[in-house]
């Protein structure tokens, strides 16, 4: 494949001076005012495209990511930038009878909780093939679960503009429902279980208290549908992604706008914070994965590799390893800090809806429309930037 670097006759490490020098040399040779060849217009158009892309730092970063999108490595053998990584499929859990939409580990006991389209919530010991407990939630349609501790799980779901919330403690369920007034497009529960955020097709972010459903605030800064939500691990920041190709960060308690990120080129499909909220991973319809610095909003890395849009993202506790699940049925693992693909895991022939890591980092779990929960053991090095 001929790259833009090949067109200009420079190597991928070329700096601005090298690019300008190469462009001047080629323009003197191929410009239509100088070169009588009928194809000189075509040659010069390709030279202009190459130069304009590579001289722009953001566009060059995206281009570099696109041409390296198929480079996935194992065990760091192929590239000095790739961190050691070992992963082994341990279990296929098949007790769910309908698509699985949400997974959550309990941070205190490492028990896994899953929920499916039929509102069944299962508790799993990761080393056992059958659920250790189950409970069916009544009313509504569960979209997300969050394990708060070894005794409490909260869940949320929506149907058109109706939102349902459940709190399940020792198999005793309490719930509330509200009519939102807007068609709900996405939902997310705070890690501490104190609140839930909902995005609407009419551009709104609504945040409600988990206890009783009291409205905390509504924000209308987006100019198109809110399509993705994420909370920071400490429940202090909410990220909203939108069809307006922006991401906004909000103070979860007050609703104050903290940061607006404009470096996304298309509709946002998934968002995830890294541990300690250093990075924000953003997936978009253009099949890109972008890593932003949360404090500054600056673009850190761009990665490509998926063939269909990403539905779900999760960071490993080590802070550098990122998992993405997509509609093509695979999970890809990335070094988010280095911007390279680590591994491609073909999992299903149906979309992956949810992916997560265990709090100790020893397990990766994914599930989706094929009703199967897949659990891998994983060994990854600690962060070392």
Name each region found by the language model.
Residues 1-34, 46-50, 54, 83-89:
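N-terminal J-domain/J-like co-chaperone modules of DnaJ/Hsp40 proteins
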Residues 107-108, 149-150, 191-192, 233-234, ...:
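Residue-level detector of Asp-centered blade-edge/turn motifs that repeat once per structural unit
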Residues 126-129, 168-171, 210-213, 252-254, ...:
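Short loop/turn segments that connect beta-strands within beta-propeller blades
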Residues 103, 121-125, 163-167, 205-208, ...:
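WD40-repeat beta-propellers
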Residues 94-100, 136-142, 178-184, 220-226, ...:
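WD40/WD-repeat beta-propeller blade N-cap
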Residues 112, 153-154, 196, 238, ...:
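Hydrophobic beta-strand positions that form the internal "hydrophobic ladder"
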Residues 115-118, 157-160, 199-202, 240-244, ...:
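Conserved strand-to-loop turn within each blade of WD40 beta-propeller repeats
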């Amino acid at each position: 494949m001929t790259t833009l670097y090949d067109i200009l006759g420079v190597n991928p490490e070329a700096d601005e001076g090298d690019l300008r020098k190469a462009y001047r040399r080629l323009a003197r040779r191929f410009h239509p005012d100088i070169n009588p060849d009928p194809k000189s217009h075509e040659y010069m158009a390709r030279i202009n495209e190459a130069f304009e892309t590579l001289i722009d730092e953001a566009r060059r970063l995206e281009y570099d990511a696109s041409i390296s999108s198929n480079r996935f490595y194992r065990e760091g053998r192929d590239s000095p930038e790739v961190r050691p990584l070992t992963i082994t499929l341990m279990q296929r859990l098949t007790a769910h009878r309908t698509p699985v939409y949400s997974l959550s580990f309990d941070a205190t006991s490492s028990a896994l909780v899953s929920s499916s389209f039929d509102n069944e919530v299962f508790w799993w010991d990761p080393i056992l093939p059958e659920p250790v407990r189950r409970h069916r939630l009544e009313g509504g349609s569960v979209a997300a679960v969050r394990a708060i501790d070894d005794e409490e799980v909260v869940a949320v779901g929506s149907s058109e503009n109706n939102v349902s919330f459940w709190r399940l403690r020792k198999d005793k369920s309490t719930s509330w429902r509200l009519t939102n007034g807007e068609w709900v497009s996405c939902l997310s529960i705070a890690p501490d279980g104190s609140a839930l955020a909902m995005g609407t097709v009419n551009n709104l972010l609504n945040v409600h208290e988990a206890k009783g459903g009291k409205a905390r605030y509504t924000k209308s800064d987006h100019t198109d549908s809110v399509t993705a939500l994420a909370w920071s691990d400490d429940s202090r920041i909410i990220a909203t992604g939108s069809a307006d190709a922006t991401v906004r960060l909000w103070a979860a308690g007050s609703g104050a706008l903290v940061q607006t990120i404009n470096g996304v080129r298309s509709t946002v499909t998934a968002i995830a914070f890294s541990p300690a909220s250093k990075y924000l991973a953003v997936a978009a319809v253009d099949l890109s994965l972008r890593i932003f610095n949360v404090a500054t909003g600056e673009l850190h890395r761009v990665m490509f590799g998926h063939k269909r849009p990403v539905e779900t993202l999760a960071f490993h506790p080590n802070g550098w390893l990122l998992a993405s699940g997509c509609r093509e049925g695979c999970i890809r693992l990335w070094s988010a800090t280095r911007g390279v693909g680590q591994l491609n895991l073909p999992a299903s022939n149906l979309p992956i809806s949810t992916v997560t890591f265990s709090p100790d980092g020893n397990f990766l779990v994914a599930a989706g429309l094929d009703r199967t929960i897949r659990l891998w053991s994983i060994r990854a090095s600690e962060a070392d930037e």
